[in-house]
Amino acid sequence: MAARGECRRAGQDSEPEPEREPESEPGPEPEPQAGLESGEAFEIVDRSQLPSPGELRSASRPRVADSWSAPILTLARRATGNLSASCGSALRAAAGLGDGGGGGERAASKGQMMEERANLMHMMKLSIKVLLQSALSLGRSLDADYAPLQQFFVVMEHCLKHGLKVKKSFIGQNKSFFGPLELVEKLCPEASDIATSVRNLPELKTAVGRGRAWLYLALMQKKLADYLKVLIDNKQLLSEFYEPEALMMEEEGMVIVGLLVGLNVLDANLCLKGEDLDSQVGVIDFSLCLKDAQDLDSGREHERITDVLDQKNYVEELNRHLSCTVGDLQTKIDGLEKTNSKLQEELSAATDRICSLQKEQQQLREQNEVIRERSEKSVEITKQDTKVELETYKQTRQGLDEMYSDVWKQLKEEKKVRLELEKELELQIGMKTEMEIAMKLLEKDTHEKQDTLVALRQQLEEVKAINLQMFHKVQSAESSLQQKNEAIASFEGKTTQVMSSMKQMEERLQQAERARQAAEERSHKLQQELSGRGSALQLQLSQLRDQCSGLEKELKSEKEQRQALQRELQREKDTSCLLQTELQQVEGLKKELRELQDEKAELRKVCEEQEQALQEMGLHLSQSKLKMEDIKEVNKALKGHTWLKDDEATHCKQCEKDFSISRRKHHCRNCGHIFCNTCSSNELALPSYPKPVRVCDSCHTLLLQRCSSTAS
């Protein structure tokens, strides 16, 4: 197993190195696939030119005889062995092409593809490790002429060409890795800028040059790993360009994507020259695998020194940021003290204003009480006046009721008299036949009675008109005086009863006229019989005339009573007008009371707003004190944090799962401990970093709570 290589950088993610794999035992060399072109994945190198493992051991010093256990040399030995085996098998396959059957060729091609994938994986790990180590020692900004960077692009190009299908066209066969890279534009819209800029370069004439330019631009954007991950996730589209056993179609592709994430710490400034990109020949440099143990020891010491320097730089940056934060906090404290003094002055002014407003409020209350007492007195006086008027009105109404009862009794008596007269008329009709002269007199008397009846009818109509006028006047009095509605309603009911009784009397008079007509008809028949009874009838007629005169006198008295009632109604109207004026005065007093109440409510609102402002000022002061205490606690906590080394962590601190190739190490920028990707996937902006950085779950929740408390 190859030991895990380490690459550290203060303030950046730590990249795990692959564990050592068991060395492949030498077996039967697989035959190459028929039609395989030489130099498809690698250039063929003469095996005799490569140093053997024995020569390497003899070349090294005696004290480092066991140095092959080191990670770089072990990987170099495996890479040289695999490459030499693949080259030898390719030469033998070229010599004995066509000897094996179809099944043997497939098995040999699969074995060869597996060996090539393993070799490319080891070379990719070595190139990335050497690139990161050299970049961290010299500086993280790289140019296009940097040898480890060029070697990385060569290995990356071989990885993308591995297992690539050959496309036939009219011109000939075309085999370029720019075709799969064009798919990234469809899968990830962010890569459209790279594709368009590569197509618009006029100096690029070949597809290989465009593919290399695409890799340069993706590395400069620090999104090479993201784009390749999107491409590998869509293997159905990749199957159109790659064989099933290709490196991009197997698990090694995801491992390479994980290794490429570590290159995001580097800043590359690459120049895109079309001639250089089109004419470059991708040759893998195996001199990286031939470092001695002394360089390895010096590399370890250099790594330790860089770790110590990174820790020192981290602590210095922390102290610098803490000093900056302390200065900012001191300025904030000064500003808060100034604002506190201003707020205290405003508070004293507000208290003076409140005292003056309270005095004004007390004066307004006293004025309000005086006005209220006056209004209450005026209301009581008006109530007493209305009570007296109501009592007088009730008394007048009782008198009217008594008068109406007397009139009703008189009408009943008249009805009785009329009934008696009808009876007497019947008797007289029986006696009218005695004398014609008496009948003439009776006719004259009847004409006179008709005249009197007409006069009585006219008087009744006048009484009706008067009653209607009274009714309308009572309705107007009801609208002005609501308290007298019930009395007027009862009065109207009684008037309607009188009207109904008058109508009944008219109907009875009509019946009497009809009876009189019948009596006249009978009188014609009984003229002979009434001739002897004329004197008696004259006496009776005189009596009837006396009764009619008495009825006329009673009607005159009723008219006088009606006139008296009209006068009383006029007086009541005058009193109602006076009451309306008094009610208007009361309404004016009510409006003044409402205005005073509104002013009082506005003053209360002003007082409440000033009290709320004072409360808010107190809350702001308490919150500023709490913020100061929180900032002091944060400074204390930051001073106690230490940056944990990669060697000291073998498992995640939160989920306690062991780290591996797929589960990488990540530092929390707040507490300095190491976590896996799932436990430290959150990003927050810290005061010591200009951009959002990786933070563990516990620190994420704690920082969010602090932010929410400060925001509230």
Curated annotation (Swiss-Prot):
SMART domains: FYVE, RUN. It is a peripheral membrane protein. Zn(2+) 2 binds at residues 668, 671, 696, 699. GO terms for biological process: early endosome to Golgi transport; endocytosis; endosomal vesicle fusion; protein transport; regulation of endocytosis; small GTPase-mediated signal transduction. Residues 325-378, 409-621 form a coiled coil. Residues 1-23, 504-527 have a biased composition (Basic and acidic residues). Broadly expressed. Highly expressed in oocytes. A zinc finger (FYVE-type) spans 646-704. Activating adapter involved in cargo sorting from early/recycling endosomes. Regulates retrieval of proteins from endosomes to the trans-Golgi network through interaction with the dynein-dynactin complex. Dual effector of RAB4B and RAB14, mediates a cooperative interaction allowing endosomal tethering and fusion. Binds phospholipid vesicles containing phosphatidylinositol 3-phosphate and participates in early endosomal trafficking. Self-assembles through coiled coil domains to drive ELVA (endo-lysosomal vesicular assembly) formation. Interacts with BMX. May interact with SSB. Interacts with RAB4 and RAB5 that have been activated by GTP-binding. Interacts WITH RAB14 and RAB4B (GTP-bound form); the interactions allow endosomal tethering and fusion. Interacts with ARL8B (GTP-bound form); the interaction is required for RUFY1 endosomal location and promotes interaction with RAB14. The FYVE-type zinc finger domain mediates interactions with phosphatidylinositol 3-phosphate in membranes of early endosomes and penetrates bilayers. The FYVE domain insertion into PtdIns(3)P-enriched membranes is substantially increased in acidic conditions. The 2 coiled coil domains mediate the interaction with the dynein-dynactin complex, the RUN domain is also involved in the interaction. The coiled coil domains also mediate self-association. This is RUN and FYVE domain-containing protein 1. The lineage of its organism: Eukaryota, Metazoa, Chordata, Craniata, Vertebrata.
